[in-house]
Amino acid sequence: EPIITVRAPAVQAQLVETYLLLCINHQTLIATKANRIVRAAQGRAVSEFGSRRAHGADAAILGARAAGIGGCSGTACTITDQLFGFNATGTMAHSWVQMFDSELEAFKTYCKCYPNGTVLLVDTYNVLKSGVPNAIKAFDEVLKPMGCRPVGIRIDSGDITYLSKKARKMLDEAGYPDCKICASNALDEYLIRDMIYQGAKVDMFGVGERLITAKSEPVFGGVYKLAAVEDDDGNIQPKIKISENVAKITTPHFKKLYRIYDKDNHKAVADLLCVHDEVIDESRPLTLFDPQFTWKKKVITNFEAKPIQQQIFKDGKCVYKKPAYENIVKYAAAEIDTLWDEITRFENPHTYYVDLSQKLWEVKNYLLAENNRQTAD
């Protein structure tokens, strides 16, 4: 979960609220959706193809960036490559094929333009009767004499599972077993999972609208809440927002977040929210408990408590060295690997717990009790 602590004069802290939520909510949402799709692909490459369906230019550019962090191997948004170094990739358009007098002529011309990166779109007219046969002819007549091999073909419509099986057989028989098949057309993690289960002969997926808009879950509900006030003497006064909905009761105080790892397998056990000055002693057993159902407890030993947050600004100056984009991608992948499969599965996943330390839980309950007392008075 994203967590940011802003400690600033009240007016300044309020001014950054909207922009922080805009950036964090949107890109966290897209990165999460991308990661689900990538995991569904089971090692097959996934490219982000969604710019045309994004909700504005910034959503396309930053959404593509987030998709890469989530695990996509490329994007059709070229400016994202220019700005962040995320690999730009893509294939031909249907309009390219339509502009020529014949599909074969369109394919042969494209092969001449991109002999080392040829991916032909074979569904403009008929995948099996013209698209794949003409692609094979173009490979034979243009690429083969040049000593080049095709990268692949793309199928963008129809029963892709069925068509990919037939296309794979045709390509193999023509001497192109290394020619990859890319599938696109309103895909998401569920469709990709089903296609693979049904035996689709697909090597790559181009995922557009359902990724760039996170169609299945289009809102990420991150919030920005006042947690404490510091007076002129430096005393911190925890603040709480109370709601009839238990889930919307905020957790007070300036906080520090630890991620607790099991040293035996380096799997994440839970996250632990603490008061900002708390230090976890790794030499002693640690009791984790559900902050709402406190009788649910777990005592762990042989663990590592890793502080998650890093300071970005201090006294108005940036003190953080921004990591290279590829390092952000690697970090995200490594953290996902620390989660149990039961947590990352699509149906009925286990809850990943964010617990409170005993000290923070006591602060929260004190403020709740104090509010009840004042209300009763």
Locations of the language-model features?
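Buried, small/hydrophobic-residue-enriched core segments of structured protein domains
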Residues: 1-177, 187-193, 197-198, 211-213, ...
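Gly/Ser/Thr/Ala-enriched C-terminal appendages of enzymes
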Residues: 169-174, 179, 187-377
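Short hydrophobic alpha-helical runs that function as membrane-insertion/retention elements
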Residues: 4-5, 90, 182, 203-206
